[in-house]
Amino acid sequence: MILTTTHTVQGREIREYKGIVCGEVVIGAHLGKDILASFTNLVGGRSNAYESTLRETRDGAIAEMIEEAQRLRADAIVGVKFDYSVIGQGGSMMMVAVSGTAVTLA
């Protein structure tokens, strides 16, 4: 499956627009990671625990979107866009959403 943030696939012609596809994953905050992230923020640097979780969450959202495009028999997803939102009471959860347009290529 070809994924691109652009609205075209270089060197290929879009034959048919199949529709909007998306994937969403919500993760909850974890006390251990929060403590580690707080310590990292105090001493400077990056929080590997949060970055790893965010990467896994983003990959899960992409996988959901690809599954939806495959059900539509698409060859590619164009105009891919990511959105990150803090949700839940007190901002206790984060949602990663990805969307794009499923297309077939000539």
Curated annotation (Swiss-Prot):
SUPFAM superfamilies named among the record's database cross-references: YbjQ-like
Pfam families membership: YbjQ_1
Protein's UniProt name: UPF0145 protein HNE_1325
Source superkingdom: Bacteria
Family that this chain belongs to: Belongs to the UPF0145 family.
Organism name: Hyphomonas neptunium (strain ATCC 15444)
Lineage: Bacteria, Pseudomonadati, Pseudomonadota, Alphaproteobacteria, Hyphomonadales
InterPro entries xrefs: UPF0145_dom_sf (IPR035439), UPF0145_YbjQ-like (IPR002765)
